[in-house]
UniProtKB/Swiss-Prot annotation:
Residues 123-135 have a biased composition (Acidic residues). Residues 136-150 have a biased composition (Low complexity). This is Ezy-1 protein. The gene is Ezy-1. Residues 1-34, 115-151, 255-297 are annotated as: Disordered.
Length: 297
């Protein structure tokens, strides 16, 4: 599917293009929920990238994402060396990003199928095998829930399919872009998946921004909340830690309470002294209120 990509005054992609196409399909009654969800997802990812570029220090992540996509792209027009990306001015990065992103999303194995539930054109093997494989991986016809969407129509990914979308981004050589894809999904997520709103907290804060160096204090705090007993972090780089947070946040969203209701508060554990306390001897032999009222007494 060719996406509508343009360059605005800031050099970013026209993230409203796909959304306008999806809205037109809604108005005409054309297209299915999965196709509309796919177009909206692409538009939301572009919007997330545009927002990222405008943040303080966002150029560092912006450059890292371009470098990741250049490495993953098989398109001859996208061939660049990592060293040339490092030296690129912001204007050149802005011009290259929309082209790379469109190519990257369209060619990431199984990504579009996770939204549409359909075998992708040109996929290897016959249609029957593709359909079986898609359904076995949780990206078949049940992957998209068309009953609700905060975007106003269209489908939303099931949590199982969403975790697979996030998981495919690392083999595609872009753990950094995985975080942006996570943010792009938020605009479409039904309210029971609101725990995924934790993911934007992974992106650089005021302390320790960028893709290199130590994890931000906010990110480290979030990681420990999601997995209290986690250890062995000293030898891990920041991208690995950010990826772990993204996965844990997605897992948190699919815990049993993710049915649209607030989770039942956990009962506090009594301290050992309270648990082991014996009642006074005179209280042990007192009849209960029910026993006193019994006709047999």
């Amino acid at each position: 599917m060719a996406a509508v990509v343009g360059t605005g005054s800031d050099g970013g992609g026209d993230e409203s293009g796909d959304r306008r196409t999806a809205d037109a399909a809604d108005a005409d009654g054309d297209g299915d929920g999965g196709e509309r969800a796919w177009l909206r997802f692409k538009a939301d990812v572009r919007a997330c990238l545009a927002d990222l570029r405008n943040r303080k220090g966002g150029i560092t992540l912006h450059r890292a994402i371009v470098k990741d996509m250049v490495s993953a792209s098989s398109n001859p027009g996208a061939r660049r060396s990592s060293s040339s990306v490092v030296k690129m001015a912001r204007e050149e990065l802005d011009r290259l990003m929309p082209f790379l992103l469109d190519d990257f999303l369209d060619n990431m194995p199984g990504l579009k199928a996770a939204f549409t539930g359909k075998a992708e054109p040109g996929a290897e093997g016959d249609d029957g095998e593709d359909e079986e494989e898609g359904e076995a991986q949780g990206v078949g016809k049940d992957a998209v829930d068309s009953s609700s969407s905060s975007s106003g129509g269209g489908g939303v990914l099931s949590c199982t399919a969403w975790q697979q979308v996030l998981g495919r981004t690392v083999p595609a050589v872009s753990p950094t872009l995985a975080l942006v894809l996570a943010c792009g999904y938020l605009a479409m997520a039904p309210r029971q998946y609101r725990a995924l709103a934790l993911v934007p907290m992974i992106l650089p804060g005021k302390t320790g921004g960028g893709v290199d160096g130590a994890l931000t204090r906010e990110g480290l705090s979030l990681l420990k909340k999601l997995r209290p007993g986690i250890s062995g972090l000293a030898d891990k780089d920041k991208q690995w830690l950010e990826w772990v947070i993204a996965r844990l946040a997605a897992e948190f969203a699919v815990q049993p309470a993710g049915d649209g209701h607030e989770p039942e508060p956990k009962r506090p554990e009594l301290p050992p002294t309270a648990v082991q306390r014996e009642p006074p001897a005179e209280e042990q032999h007192k009849p209960t209120a029910g026993a006193r009222d019994s006709p047999n007494m």
